[in-house]
Amino acid sequence: MKVTLPEFERAGVMVVGDVMLDRYWYGPTSRISPEAPVPVVKVNTIEERPGGAANVAMNIASLGANARLVGLTGIDDAARALSKSLADVNVKCDFVSVPTHPTITKLRVLSRNQQLIRLDFEEGFEGVDPQPLHERINQALSSIGALVLSDYAKGALASVQQMIQLARKAGVPVLIDPKGTDFERYRGATLLTPNLSEFEAVVGKCKTEEEIVERGMKLIADYELSALLVTRSEQGMSLLQPGKAPLHMPTQAQEVYDVTGAGDTVIGVLAATLAAGNSLEEACFFANAAAGVVVGKLGTSTVSPIELENAVRGRADTGFGVMTEEELKLAVAAARKRGEKVVMTNGVFDILHAGHVSYLANARKLGDRLIVAVNSDASTKRLKGDSRPVNPLEQRMIVLGALEAVDWVVSFEEDTPQRLIAGILPDLLVKGGDYKPEEIAGSKEVWANGGEVLVLNFEDGCSTTNIIKKIQLDKKG
């Protein structure tokens, strides 16, 4: 099985928010100014890129989706440069021009890949009549699959609550990248995407993952949100939804050069994926992968479909990710040539919980590579009953593949993975629970090949069945 990209070409997204122009001056520096203790930069390259809400729209358009952008600008060279840059990448702009204000511009001076200073040219748009923005939203609602409200606290979203209500009445999901600590103004949004510092500024410092979940769920209830996605830098992302287990996704970034605009990339990919008809869990998976790409670039950047595809599929080239059985056999053969010990386990992994994560981490410590074989939906139904699985196969595999402990994820259709194990022949076969080694499917084949079979204990108190029962009781209550 392969993870396929969303059909971005059928996705329509409108972005409304604070648009700005990012200017970059690049050059070498080799001396200190005689006028003051500051470096002298000899500027040899000047770049201009859309920033803020405009960068969100750029990220959406770069995926091949239909992006529309609404915001406030002045009537100046910066507005014209912004419009031209966006038109060049197929973003449809419908700006409201405010003659009394300049277009927000941020100038960054860089040398040797280091940002030395940033200069801001702006006056807030507070007090500007929001009606033209509302009219543009109303005109687009019938032809878009998601509305993004990109808030940089510059005034374009002064009437954000009215915008939310317009979209929700039309059945269009509203995604918001929030600013400040007044989350009351975002009441009723479909999804908020604060980073960890923004989240903690509202709910207080969180020392544990459990505190993030507890306070995040309270925030969802307090402000009538459908979901909350907390982006946590090197710790990845946490998706919280009422009635569902938390989804924690580790970062996929390999190198971090610049986090400028990473939040814009996340919400842009989320919106485009949802507008293409994918689930919120899938949207988070793709957004997490995209964030891992964009922080490896310098300055405000976007992610192309090819880069995103390489991020989610290309892990197979380096020995990671969701694979077909044939791809897995090739990856295992390559691992053996490198002298790596291959560990294999299997299960349904319907609602991933702390017990699963702990078990998989312990299994991974026993070797160099960990394979997780997952029951298909039909296999799960035969094993667990008609009400299972709760999460379909592709979503279960995506979540498992995002775990740091897991190298390869593969599915099987049969009641047991015996045939699959016989074809892979891992060096170590691991199963959780109270099995006897000889009872484990595939054990005979592994032993016959000189391998080992081991039973690991699950963490006490963790059970998918118990989680489902608790959710059902909470709904009744």
Curated annotation (Swiss-Prot):
Keywords: Acetylation, ATP-binding, Carbohydrate metabolism, Kinase, Lipopolysaccharide biosynthesis, Multifunctional enzyme, Nucleotide-binding, Nucleotidyltransferase, Transferase. This is Bifunctional protein HldE. It comes from Escherichia coli O6:H1 (strain CFT073 / ATCC 700928 / UPEC). The gene is hldE. ATP binds at residues 195-198. Homodimer. Transmembrane segments: none annotated. It is an enzyme of class 2 (transferase). In the N-terminal section; belongs to the carbohydrate kinase PfkB family. It catalyses: D-glycero-beta-D-manno-heptose 7-phosphate + ATP = D-glycero-beta-D-manno-heptose 1,7-bisphosphate + ADP + H(+); D-glycero-beta-D-manno-heptose 1-phosphate + ATP + H(+) = ADP-D-glycero-beta-D-manno-heptose + diphosphate. The keyword Metal-binding does not apply.
